[in-house]
Amino acid sequence: EISECLVGSEMCIRDRIKEGAKCNIFFSAGVAQMDELQNGYDGGSVVDGTRVDLLNNQVCLVTYKNSGTAVTGFAEISKAKNMALADRTVPVGQYTRAALVNAKMVEGDASNPQDISDSDISKALDGLEINSCANVGAVASAVAEGANEIGTVYYSDTFGYENQLDIIEKLPNSLTGDVIYPIAALKGDSTTSDELEAAKEFIAYLQTDEAMSVFEKYHFSVKE
């Protein structure tokens, strides 16, 4: 039984854990956020031997149904009137910024995408209006509702939006880098042995064929 689930951007969840929120498992859409906890934090740590790179995802460029956009691929996003873009502190925003650098559309360091601001992107893309969104869900909603012409989301986030979103392009990993979802058990000062064992068992279950079939239904792929 899961008594509480922390939901939000990886940065917010990571910070809450660092500030003392009790958590037995951390499941992240970004490797960097897991790495920070792996290095230890006040009152807790990642349990050795429990970290697993569980899933892959893919970043997609999307538009709303019947938008009539002139954008036919990632290289043409400057043709849009505006774009919903996740904040540079969250993984999908970082993957998108890395892709822009690797595609030579924006100057910067692809290994430090958090340093690339919305204004940097707008200037490089002919003044493209950027709607900064707190997380990937906000991007999906902004585009699906027609508030923004295009946006970047995970492929998994298009599930349930089939009647509202069109995928313009699935970005190759050569641009974004691997989109990996790591999971690990956490141990804090108040973690009991039963809680730790349950966390390990749950992580093991998520690696079974039964669990993977559910993930694949929602557009995730299995990390080999």
Regions found by a protein language model. Give the residues of each.
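Short aromatic/basic micro-patch
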Residues: 6, 27, 152
